[in-house]
Amino acid sequence: MGQYTINLRESYPVWKIGSKIDSTKEECLDYMLFIASPLLAGQATTLGVAIRRTLLESIQGTAIVAAKIYGAAHEYSTLEGIQESIHDILLNLKQVIIKNKICEFQKCLISIIGPKKVTAADIELSQNITISNPYHHIATITKPIRFQVELIINKGRGYLIQDGNDVQDGYFPVDALFNPVRNVNFSIHNLAEQQEALILEIWTNGAITPLDALRQGSENLIHLFLPPFGLEDDTYMTSLGSQDYNIHIKNSLKEKFELHSIERIEDSHLIKDQFLEYSKTPIELLELSTRPFKCLKNANIYTINDLLKLSQQDLLKISNMGPSSVKQIVEALDKRFGINLKLK
């Protein structure tokens, strides 16, 4: 029977920012790519799934939850001198992105005399609140009249769907998307010595940065795992502590654990096969310095698979690529993936 050696590593993975794209006036979307490595086999999947679920479900945000539009009879009515219907104005208010550092509940005001195009920048806010998309269109005033709206903003998680007919004190309910995280992707890439790297991509709406979202999500996960550390061996339900009951529970758990272990082993093989190729492994994992990294990018070399199609002599032919840069690439390939790049 063969012997297997498991290398138990005491160190923790290093997190780095691979790339970053800030939002523009036209598209309010922040993007960051994070790299966590080295991880033991299987850890990247555990980490990636947990972080993705947390970021998409539990990050707190702020949104407009109600609006009182002066002169509006009902949601589908119109106002003289206002181009949009009340319904369209409410939909536009729903897409206003709010940064809120402190306050949970607050009232805000729009009070503008036309003619004018009303944008999110026209919302009067307190010092602790700002708008991430100030150029977002709300309404068009076509006549010299006053357009006045009272807004209620609040903090929350997830998505709030409200009854459109539930109008209280003249306030129309506004469906609210609180979560500032718009999308999360992760991929797993094999390194040398049975280690893995996790690449995590996060998009946010500009209310918080992807880095802040990652920090908040990590804190939420930490709080989920803290309670077991306060348990002691004798803190169990003695009312259900009979010997027969304990034997039954142990047998049930043993059966479930054995079945679950088999399924997990099969899943791990599927995952390893899925990410075995280097065609989707970005060169960011090499952790190169700026010069060789930019040279590779300018030569349209984006993945490890692209790099392996070339030899060391081919790399020297790339513009601005010197011997020291090639040496750094060769050493990084060997260190991170156990790959020896061919000379010619």
Curated annotation (Swiss-Prot):
Region ranges (Alpha C-terminal domain (alpha-CTD)): 270-344
Q: Mind naming one GO cellular-component term on file for this protein? A: mitochondrion
What does the annotation say about its assembly with partners?
Answer: In plastids the minimal PEP RNA polymerase catalytic core is composed of four subunits: alpha, beta, beta', and beta''. When a (nuclear-encoded) sigma factor is associated with the core the holoenzyme is formed, which can initiate transcription.
- UniProt family annotation: Belongs to the RNA polymerase alpha chain family.
Enzyme nomenclature, EC number: 2.7.7.6
EC category: transferase
Q: Name one GO molecular function term.
A: protein dimerization activity
The text the record gives for the protein's domains is: The N-terminal domain is essential for RNAP assembly and basal transcription, whereas the C-terminal domain is involved in interaction with transcriptional regulators and with upstream promoter elements.
Has the keyword Transferase been applied to this entry? yes
What reaction(s) does this enzyme catalyze?
Answer: RNA(n) + a ribonucleoside 5'-triphosphate = RNA(n+1) + diphosphate
Q: Name one Pfam family in it.
A: RNA_pol_A_bac
What CDD domains does the record point to?
Answer: RNAP_alpha_NTD
Where is this protein localized, as stated in its record? Plastid, Chloroplast
Q: Which organism is it from?
A: Spirogyra maxima
Q: Looking at the keywords, is Transferase present?
A: yes
* Protein name from the UniProt record: DNA-directed RNA polymerase subunit alpha
Ordered alphabetically, the record's keywords are:
Chloroplast, DNA-directed RNA polymerase, Nucleotidyltransferase, Plastid, Transcription, Transferase
**Classification via InterPro entries:** DNA-dir_RNA_pol_insert, DNA-dir_RNA_pol_RpoA/D/Rpb3, DNA-dir_RpoA, RBP11-like, RNAP_asu_C, RNApol_insert_sf
Q: Which Gene3D superfamilies match?
A: 5' to 3' exonuclease, C-terminal subdomain, DNA-directed RNA polymerase, insert domain, RNA polymerase, RBP11-like subunit
